[in-house]
From Swiss-Prot:
Annotated spans, Interaction with host APOBEC3G: 40-44
Compartmental location: Host cytoplasm; Host cell membrane; Virion
Keyword Transmembrane appears in the UniProt entry: no
Region (Interaction with host APOBEC3F): 14-17, 74-79
Record PTM: Processed in virion by the viral protease. Highly phosphorylated on serine and threonine residues.
Protein role: Counteracts the innate antiviral activity of host APOBEC3F and APOBEC3G by promoting their ubiquitination and degradation. Acts as a substrate recognition component of an E3 ubiquitin-protein ligase complex: mechanistically, Vif hijacks a host cullin-5-RING E3 ubiquitin-protein ligase complex (ECS complex) and the transcription coactivator CBFB/CBF-beta to form an active E3 ubiquitin-protein ligase complex that targets APOBEC3G and APOBEC3F for polyubiquitination, leading to their degradation by the proteasome.
Name the record gives this protein: Virion infectivity factor
Bilayer topology annotation: Peripheral membrane protein
Pfam families, per the entry: Vif
GO BP annotation list: viral life cycle
Region (RNA-binding): 75-114
Primary gene name: vif
């Protein structure tokens, strides 16, 4: 019998981001109680030797499963050290891979307070308006002038600790171009 291979998308991350993700998930499960119904599965509760943890997040009838791995083949950079994350959307027997932005949007829609464009209608009708959105990155599109005015009027408030974000977990800050503040460099070399 031949080997059967299963291919999955695994996002390479460093282990400190995985530790931060796990601690944020546990905080919102046990302290803030915003992550109701979430299930955290430890590495010793699974039979797969490369799985370090799993987080099962109910989203309607389906659920998002974020699996963190260790002991994978070493990544492109030395700090990756073979750690990774896969994100899966499951509904009964159907499973599919999900990118981090989509996972964050699904979590945001089901679990955390949101100040959305419907707030304009609520304010016009004289109903109470939710004062903030706990995941503003979920609203990347440019809002209407009324929406922008209402958000400026309500004001933003920093959340401590931040909400668990799959996008933040998988972002690659190491390979981004580093900008030095206040450093012009050699004027001959930079074209001035």
């Amino acid at each position: 019998m031949e080997n059967r291979w299963q291919v999955m998308v695994v996002w390479q991350v460093d282990r400190m981001k995985i530790r931060k993700w796990n601690s944020l998930v546990k905080h919102h499960m046990y302290v803030s109680k915003k992550a109701k119904g979430w299930y955290y599965r430890h590495h010793y509760e699974t039979h797969h030797p490369k799985i370090s943890s799993e987080v099962h997040i109910p989203v309607g009838q389906a659920r998002l499963v974020t699996v963190t791995y260790w002991g994978l083949t070493t990544g492109e950079q030395s700090w990756h050290l073979g750690h990774g994350v896969s994100i899966e959307w499951r509904l009964r027997k159907y499973k599919t891979q999900v990118d981090p932005e989509m996972a964050d949007k699904l979590i945001h829609l089901h679990y955390f307070d949101c100040f959305t464009a419907s707030a304009i209608r609520q304010a016009v009708l004289g109903r109470p308006v939710l004062p903030r959105c706990e995941y503003p990155a979920g609203h990347k599109q440019v809002g209407t002038l009324q929406y922008l005015a209402l958000t400026a009027w309500v004001g933003a408030k920093k959340r401590k600790p931040p909400l668990p974000s799959v996008t933040k977990l998988t972002e690659d800050r190491w390979n981004e171009h580093q900008k030095m503040q206040g450093h012009r460099g050699n004027p001959i070399m930079n074209g001035h």
